[in-house]
C-alpha cells in the first residue's frame, strides 16, 4: 500500500519518510471510518432495520439507530488501535520484529479493522451501555491530549514567526504583522464570543451560564496578562499574546459547546435534545486536526510539560531514490508506536461521544429484542455529563497553559522546549 501511495520505482518523485507514509495510512483509515460514522449518525439505511441489535429502537427513530451504529463503528476502530498499541509496547528499535507489523502487513490490518467493525454489530447492546461511559471517560482523556497539542502548536507557531522575523530582518515585518493580527484577532474573537454568549445564554436567572462565561473570561485574561509579564518572559521568552489568544479562543469555544449541550430547560436555548450542528462540525474539525497533528509528531508530545523522551531517527536511506520511500527508522523508531495508537483509540471514542452528543443508554433491559412499537432506549444528553466535561476541560487548558508559564520559574533546572 505504501508503494502505491508514494509511487512505483522508476518514477521521478520526491521520496517521503517511511514513518510518515505509515502514519498517513492510519490517518486515512481514521478519516474513512469517521466519515462513515458521521453519515450514519444522521441517515440509516433500510437494511439496518434487519439487525437485531437495532430493534430496541422505536420504528422511525433514526437518532437511536444512528447512535447505536456510531457506537459500533467507533468501538471497532478503537479496539483496532488498542490491540496494535498493546502489541507495540516498548518497541524502540527498527530491528524489533513487531516494528514490521507497524509499517507493513497492510492487507492483513485492513482485514482486521473490517472484521472488528463487522463483529461489533453482533455484540449485545448491554455491552454498549457500559461502552458509552468508557467512551465518555476516554473522550475526556482525548480532550486533555487536544489541550496539550493546542498549547504546543501555539508555541511552535509563535516561535516560527519570531524566528522568521529575526532571520529576515527588515523584510520580516510581514511576519510581525501576521503575528499581531493572529494574536489580537484571537483575543477579539474570544471577547466577542463571550459577549454574545452573555446576551443569548446568560440572560435572566441563568446564573450557572453567567458563571461559566464570566469565570472563563476572567481566568483567561489573568493568564494572558501573566504571559507578557517581565518575570515570565525572563524564564519563558517564547511566551506572548498569541498563545494566550489561542487558548482564550479555544476555551471560549468549549464554554459555547458546553452551554449548547445543556438539556432543554430555562437556561438552554435548545428546545430539543439535539445538539447544534455548528458544535458538532467544529468539534469534528478539532478532532481531525488533533489526530493528524499527533500522528505526525516525532515523539510523545510531553516536552512542553518538561518531560523529554525523544525518539531518534536515521534519515539517510540509500534506497530512497528508487523506492520513493526513505527509511528514517534504520535503527531507532521515529515516534512512540504505543502512544500513537493510544491517541487514535481515544480519538475514536471521543468521536463516538461527539457524534452521539454524549448519549447514554437508559437503565431499561436492552438485551431483549423489542417490537417496533417499543420506546427508544437511547437517552441523548439526558444529564449534565458533557456540559461538565467541557467546562472542566476549559479550566484544565488554562491550568496547563499557566503551568507552561510558571513551570520554568519553579523548576529552573529542567529544560523547557
Swiss-Prot record:
It is a multi-pass membrane protein. Its main location: endoplasmic reticulum. InterPro entries: TDE1/TMS. It holds the Pfam family Serinc. It comes from the Eukaryota. It is found in: Endoplasmic reticulum membrane. This is Probable serine incorporator. The lineage of its organism: Eukaryota, Amoebozoa, Evosea, Eumycetozoa, Dictyostelia.
